[in-house]
């Protein structure tokens, strides 16, 4: 039995889950999500708890058991409390501004970079920049009820200007540590 798969998922007071054929629909204060179920897994809802069982002990069913439970737990948490990801934009003149459903970045290129946010993901830029290692840093917070879409959006934003190892300029996750390198030293 999968150690993760056998754990029950507690649904919050304001979270509703309905099994509709091959998918589970979640509804809560932060929005709606639906999760498609793989063929070898069954879901039951009793007394505000959701349990996931596999149909047989094949390798495929065992691998899908814990994965499906985790995806369902993330959906339940997403519609009740939501998810948040913080990024730091570090560099002189590096800025971000949210305009509607797009983020306008100034990242040291000769042109501004416009990033369109996917459906269900919102962004917020910190009001005042702060200094970290003598570089101005602007905070960017992404929020969504869908953990997968939030992670993909954060990866795509980070790839616009990944942090470089010499000065640490670029876009990085707030909790990420950049391994710094020493510059060239001239010999005399």
From Swiss-Prot:
HAMAP family xref list: Ribosomal_uL6_B (MF_01365_B)
Transmembrane segments: none
Protein name as it appears in the record: Large ribosomal subunit protein uL6
Source superkingdom: Bacteria
Family: Belongs to the universal ribosomal protein uL6 family.
Positions in coiled-coil regions: none
Gene Ontology annotations of biological process type: cytoplasmic translation
Record-linked Gene3D superfamilies: Ribosomal protein L6, alpha-beta domain
Role: This protein binds to the 23S rRNA, and is important in its secondary structure. It is located near the subunit interface in the base of the L7/L12 stalk, and near the tRNA binding site of the peptidyltransferase center.
Organism: Myxococcus xanthus (strain DK1622)
GO molecular function terms listed in the Swiss-Prot or TrEMBL record: rRNA binding; structural constituent of ribosome
Pfam families hit by this protein: Ribosomal_L6
Keyword list, A-Z: Ribonucleoprotein, Ribosomal protein, RNA-binding, rRNA-binding
